[in-house]
């Protein structure tokens, strides 16, 4: 009878990465790093049958989402996921991918990327050991709360993923991390890029002086205030904020238009100011805040955002840079 002390039980399966088309380049970089790191790292269990597949040339599991001429699609797996800890990587705001529908070219929207992810999960048919979704930009994160007769799309998406068998969701700088309340019994990890912001800022602008007399962190609206406070606490500087005055009698493109940005805080005259937010969409609000800070005699203005969507293009930013805004 074998000695039970030689039996090893591990609570994890072998690693598998499925980068969808929207996140293919990043997935390949992660795969290359993991393969190199595991090959160089010492592990006493490498030759143990329990850890079979620990060291491989690649951890990517091949998948695809081919489309019919009608625009409908299906998820397919070319590799087995049985007993595997699968990490699915998806970038729902990658607008560079196109497909044909009824002979016409159509750009993939966040809804298309999200649907493809669900198709791949469905193709696993419950055979994976665990499923983790890595979604840098949280799908529908801006629709995190209800105003009157509106759908709660982000909460619905999270509950839908959990219902499909997803064990953990990893995202970066969620628009409102409290949306995880929709799935209180499942994993939701929100990773903040504060360290990367500070490191890049100091490397690119070495003459910054980090004190309250020379620097100030600005929140462009009420929603970004928590980020601004957290960032300012790390730098040891003061915080200011703008709030948006809206015209609630009018709706333009699905939202109440902004009438003006009003400032709350100490004087910014002669100071370097940092505007921080989770995303730049069209960029109009960010640039309006920057112009107002310049009008208040701020020395230099830096805009930091986790996600640069630039839905209206980059021309307005190039123009603002040229004008010294």
Give a label for each model feature.
Residues 1-325:
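PRPP-associated nucleotide enzymes
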